Amino acid sequence: RVVFFTDKDGDDKPDSKKNLFTGISGTQHDHGIHAVHFGPDGKFYFNFGNAGRQIKDEAGKPIIDLAGNEVNDKRKPYQQGMVFRCNEDGSDFETLGWNFRNNWEVAVDSFGSVWQSDNDDDGNRGVRINYVMEYGNYGYRGEFTGKGWRDKRTNIEKEVPLRHWHLND
């Protein structure tokens, strides 16, 4: 879950606590949720890897993002790891990118560009740094079939690092 603490009087002790988001799988898993950061626009940015599965509100209801989609990995349309942006209160929730494996620590630069790393599943032979172009599918699994990089497919590359991200499908 994502817990939001507020210090109203500046004494470095929380005066209130709110469960902003719940239902996220992968607790204590390196493919689960990662740190929340503020962007220069004052919004929260965070991500989870492919163990995150879904995100729900404080009451346990599925989050519906600004595109009108339920935020989960059931391929309708999202799958695998995702990166998000929302207001401090959780409103205006956006799914900025999806179909990552183990995307790690989203970062937002002073221009508002979003960056993160994503790594493979066979000894780091396919690690990549992503510029997160908003609303993109980043290809860890095949978009139409959901197949992984080990599955036979048209134009399969000979080298493992080139297979991971379906760049030649």
What are the language-model segments listed below?
Residues 1-169:
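Beta-propeller domains with acidic blade repeats across secreted/periplasmic ectodomains
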